[in-house]
Amino acid sequence: LSSFLVNSEIRKRIKKIKKVSKIFTKKPYEKTISKLNFNLTNDQKNALENINNDLSSKSKMFRLLQGDVGSGKTIVSLISALNVIESNFQVAFMAPTEILARQHFNLAKQLFPKNTKIKLLSSKSDIFEKKKIIQELKNHKIEIVFGTHAIFQKKIIFSKLGYIIIDE
């Protein structure tokens, strides 16, 4: 009950904060869905519609997408991220482990248009690659970055961060 009350209060406060709405077409959304070797479920379609409505509104979004392992939460997240990228915003996709971050990164590379600027920031990246990624995020040369909690540090500055996905 206390968790519910805390989340309710957070949602109320977030709704009061104004933001720039994202304007996007359904073209990247539809192209990505057509690449899938399965059809989205009605629940996935509804989740995407709700997320897209929130993204295009003037209120901040705080949404929990829940489901069993393999239920398609990642696909829904990636498709919604593509719409944000299409609106010229950056996306940060944080996973709890480096292995999972790499899996999401590889899936995005398969699904997203080839010209999408996608990077993985990991502890296995050498110091020069990390510095390059940090600079590219700051200069909006990267549209979506995947990583662990390391993508949220003081030295990492996004040019135009518009969407954060946290996979728990």
Per-range role (PLM):
Residues 1-93:
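Pre-Walker A segment
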Residues 33, 37, 52-56, 109, ...:
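Signal for well-folded cores of large energy- and translation-related assemblies
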Residues 65, 92, 157, 165-166:
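Walker B beta-strand of ABC/ABC-like P-loop ATPase nucleotide-binding domains
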Residues 148, 167-168:
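Walker B catalytic acidic pair
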Residues 90-97, 119:
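Conserved RecA-like ASCE P-loop NTPase motor core of nucleic-acid helicases/translocases
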Residues 100-136:
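Conserved helix-turn-beta segment of the N-terminal RecA-like "Helicase ATP-binding" lobe
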Residues 121-145, 152-161:
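Conserved motor-coupling elements within RecA-like helicase/translocase cores
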Residues 57-58, 83-87, 111-113, 135-140, ...:
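Conserved catalytic network of the ASCE P-loop NTPase/AAA+ motor domain
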